[in-house]
Amino acid sequence: VRAVAGGLVAAATLLSGLALAPTAMAADSATADNAPSVAGHAYNELPYNNPDVTVTQIDNSSLPSYMRNPIGQNEGIDTPNDLSQNYYSADASALSYDGKLFVFTGHDEASPDYGSFNMKDWGVYVTDEDGLNQGKWTHYKTIAKADLFSWATGDGAYAGQVVADDNGTPSDTSDDWFYYYVPVKDKASEAAGQDPFAIGVAKSKSPLGPWKDAIGKPLLTTSQTQIETIDPAFFVDEDGTGYLHFGTFGTQLAIKMKKDATTGRTSY
């Protein structure tokens, strides 16, 4: 897993616990001149012809300084530092890769009287170190949907995490794969009257997708774990061993993941 030293890593650590609040903010469509790139692909080119990517350029530099200071420079816990205030989102998970910071989030579309979550997709905010200091991000509103898994109901797109895998060749980004560990609701479990939550894993050659089911079935279901199987978080130890943590209110479990040169970290 590749990480970038310096400010982006510190920001990634802090952003992993950041809630993104829903005030309109200056926004313009990204152009070829201002769109950043990763692994040789300009973001606005919609890498690998992903029809779900919608691009918005976010510039909060005109906002009061307390709302656009880099993470960690605000005093007091009550000063806001939102990436965006017009997109209902939470459960941020950060990936520092190739000089860019990606903040993946869920997306809640519930109406005020719904009484629960209505989450069917995931998006991502992207910046680099200059953008981070200037308060400028590019927002990709929908990079993946829960129904990309044929076995899933298309709902329950809660907190997930993306992991970059260099396949043992850190100097060559063309070999890199990205794995997205996400909670979704499993059709079979729901039909059986069980808690429907399961963890799926998708893979892509780009952090923006398109994402496809990596194994064609749930990685974990509640019937296997005996707890609500949500909110996966991946950790790679210093020796290269990967652990997938997950859990629910008051309980957390972890499984040791296998590493395969062909399939990546998709089994345990």
Regions found by a protein language model. Name each.
Residues 1-28:
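Secretory targeting and sorting signals
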Residues 30-268:
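Carbohydrate-active catalytic/glycan-binding domains of CAZyme proteins
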